[in-house]
Amino acid sequence: MGIIDIFFPKKKEQVAINSYFRTLNAYTPSFTTYDGGLYEMDLTRSAIHTFANQVSKLKPEVTGKARPELNKILQYKPNPIMDTTKFLYKLATILSVHNTAIIAPLFNKDETKIIGLYPLLPSNAEVVEYRKKLWLRYRFINGEVGAIEFDKVGILNQYFYRDEFFGESNGAMSNTLKLLDIQNQGMQDAIEQSATIRFMAKIGQNVRPEDLKAERDRFSQMNLSNENRSGVMIFDAKYADVQQIESKPYLIDSDQMESIKNNVFNYF
């Protein structure tokens, strides 16, 4: 039995739910794993990696009647495709990025024994009620939908506030992430511009736009291309002025960058 078969069993009764389970505060318990590209920024990924890397070094332990078997599973190979280090790293990463991490049990064929644990990363999940019992219904990005009894899953969360089951989004970081993106874009644009515009030339007469473009290309080809190996630039009297643009290094606002870094590392 593969992991896909475990999460999407064909013979199990499909859970048909018409409405969400309503919590005491009337908040609909659902969450989505889209968080505005939080993991796609180098600074935030670095902070998350540092945390996840430290978590991956931990040694999980289990107490209770199932201790011997589950301890062996957790300490060596929680599931068929992950050892303990990878399992803990992925779990910590999911928790940092989405503030909610779901641990689903893997059962044997007759569902009498837990044979593994897997960190789920659905595109969205919701707590629903069916026959007076809570279920966790989840959907993956490929459209596959599954459901499991809520009391069989483990849920880790942080920034735990409105929802009785899931953590809050990372909306509190949106302003910092926007500043980080703006600074990165500004740095990239400045570097590209300083690397492409090297000379400014002024022609001493009115020229049609198409002729101006042709003259610019001719001037560049003659003086600025690899064909000119002499190091000497020559131009005729039609040019009133030719000036070299000094290429200056783009300097990052160190105070602003330090503030952004502090916000990111304090958050994570």
Model-identified regions with their sequence ranges:
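Structured, contiguous alpha/beta core segments that scaffold functional sites
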Residues: M1-D253, M257-S259, N263-N266
